[in-house]
Amino acid sequence: MLMPKSVALLRIRYTLEAALARGFTTVRDCGGAEGFLKAEIRQGSLNGPRLITCGHAISQTGGHGDLRSGALPASAFDSCSCHFGQVGVVADGVPECYKAAREEFRRGADFIKIMGGGGVASPTDKISNKQFCDDEIKALVDVANSYHTYVTAHAYTAEAIQNCIKLGVKGIEHGNLLDERTAELMAELGCYLTPTLVTYKVMGSDQFSAFLGPENSRKNTEVLYKGIDAMKIAQKKKVKICFGSDLLGPLYGYQTQEFRIRGKVQTTQEILLSATVTPAEMNGLGDKLGQIKPGFIADLLMMKSNPLDDITILDEPESNILFVMKEGRIY
């Protein structure tokens, strides 16, 4: 059941303030956050991380961003908006892809997010599906290039990832089923990988397993156990890795568990780089964010102890963060 937009708006203040309190001074949103939120944060009406947003994620009909049930024809949904979520929009064919991407930029998007393959939570696709035709992806990339920014793609399989990055996509979200050749290609093309391992762990737990139906749970299990292996491959092939979580709504509070999970694969320094320097570079902010240096924006955390010695302290922000500084202001 979709959350009413009015309820989502009521929860935004808490979500933003809680993320900042956990130490996240910048957050990249890959579907749903609108431009007005960035403006309110900049103006000080809301306390929260600065936002880097894509607006809505763009999906093909029947793709990961299409929330319509497969039990009814598309015409059954024409007279209502009950099937529209806050996360995605649907576009088919090159003209619609041009228009959808330009509309997101018109509304203040910083980059474009597409659904390049099947997903766990979507009702009518398989994870193995490759989504969008080549000319559609190329159209979306061309629009992003004209705005001097990038396209990132939701994709799990090696086939979907390779298809996207060969057409100019510069970011891959999730990537749980990539193989060595795919990782090599990502490294060669300078493509960024953002694993979201905590999502599958939380959704697979007894506490939240009821959120997914039987088929969606099966898909979640499939990607859960292969995500760590994919990260090992990406690390070995020197793919640029960013920190991510992909948690929605009340689950967002679990985002710091990603630090603990990544400790199984990455060194503490590599994990910290994935949450600071590398994503700043990905988003064209490498000369402003991610480091404590003269001329950089004054974002920093004051900790009780050194996360380089124990990365898991970042998963316990309430007891380990003394204060969060964003743009020189202490929160």
Curated annotation (Swiss-Prot):
Stated name of the protein: Uncharacterized protein YJL213W
A Pfam family reported for this protein in Swiss-Prot or TrEMBL: Amidohydro_1
Signal peptide (UniProt feature, chain positions): none
CDD domains on file: Met_dep_hydrolase_A (cd01299)
Ranges in a coiled coil: none
Transmembrane segments: none
Organism annotation: Saccharomyces cerevisiae (strain ATCC 204508 / S288c) (Baker's yeast)
GO MF entry, a single one: hydrolase activity, acting on carbon-nitrogen (but not peptide) bonds
Family, as annotated: Belongs to the metallo-dependent hydrolases superfamily.
